[in-house]
Amino acid sequence: MSVNYEQVNVAPLVLLSVLDHYKRMNTPDNKRCVGVLLGDNSGSTIKVTNSFALPFEEDEKNPDVWFLDHNYIENMNDMCKKINAKEKMIGWYHSGPKLRSSDLKINGLFKKYTQGNSLLLIVDVKQQGVGLPTDAYMAIEEVKDDGSSTERTFVHLPTAIEAEEAEEIGVEHLLRDVRDQAAGNLSLRLTNQLKSLQGLQRKLRDIVAYLDKVNSGQLPANHIILGKLQDVFNLLPNLGSPDEEAPATKKDDVLASSNTLQKALTVKTNDELMVIYISNLMRAIIAFDNLIENKIKNKKLQEAKRDPEPEEATKEEIQQQESAKA
């Protein structure tokens, strides 16, 4: 069974509310906080626009023991409907940072209040790495390949941070105070690229760890995940050498691919350096041409300042000659 949603868009206000909730109830035990998500799930994209906190208690030793105030949920939901009738209860959140064994049971409880399947949003309030601090999940009935009975499990949904115009203005105002004003555009671009590469490296490590667990039998093979990984591998460029004959050994194949990649990178680098060289050459020629024009203008101005005196003298001589003729 699959879900009918493609993506989950989370408003920045929700992230700020979750962080404020965690900071207010933070204890030495670092217990997780739980709350309700409000928004719209009528389309193919779930929009999470608001949230409110819930009183929640659980036993750390026994994950099956937990407490939620049902009356509080119903009263808060009724009050939120009076403020904005378009926002409805679509799921719940907790501060994670990972899934827990009791999440399926808690999700089943929230399913009674939501129209359709309940959304679980995990917000990592202490994220150390790069990337979005959110993970969205939906509970589905997983059909096993061996024909045994189905069981409920969570399926991951991609998330994105999306804000309205008013929220964007507020977020930009906050980032202006947080951002280092001394840092230039180049340093910011390099920092963003470095963070992107670090996030890519972290994702690749997660993929390798998952495949190792599947290979060792610790996790069952999920054909949907394997199919998506195969699609990613199919998008990779072919670094082999089509001009050469098939190498005799695998080592020779690797060397041929490495040489082809090195050649491609060298050609691309040379092209970029050639563009930079031509651009600098054109800039120097334009500057030299402007310098020549400036020298010519200055010379003409200096000559114009000296020429008026003889011109006036010439006019006086012409007048004297005309008077003499008369």
UniProtKB/Swiss-Prot annotation:
Protein's GO biological process: proteasome-mediated ubiquitin-dependent protein catabolic process
Occurrences of domain MPN (ranges): 8-143
Cellular component terms per the entry's GO annotation: mitotic spindle midzone; proteasome complex; proteasome regulatory particle, lid subcomplex; proteasome storage granule
Keywords: Proteasome
Keyword Ubl conjugation attributed: no
GO molecular function, one term: metallopeptidase activity
Keyword Glycoprotein: no
Region (Disordered): 299-326
UniProt cross-references to SMART domains, sorted A to Z: JAB_MPN
Chain's role: Acts as a regulatory subunit of the 26S proteasome which is involved in the ATP-dependent degradation of ubiquitinated proteins.
Family, per entry: Belongs to the peptidase M67A family.
Protein name in UniProt: 26S proteasome regulatory subunit RPN8
Provenance organism: Eremothecium gossypii (strain ATCC 10895 / CBS 109.51 / FGSC 9923 / NRRL Y-1056)
Lineage: Eukaryota, Fungi, Dikarya, Ascomycota, Saccharomycotina
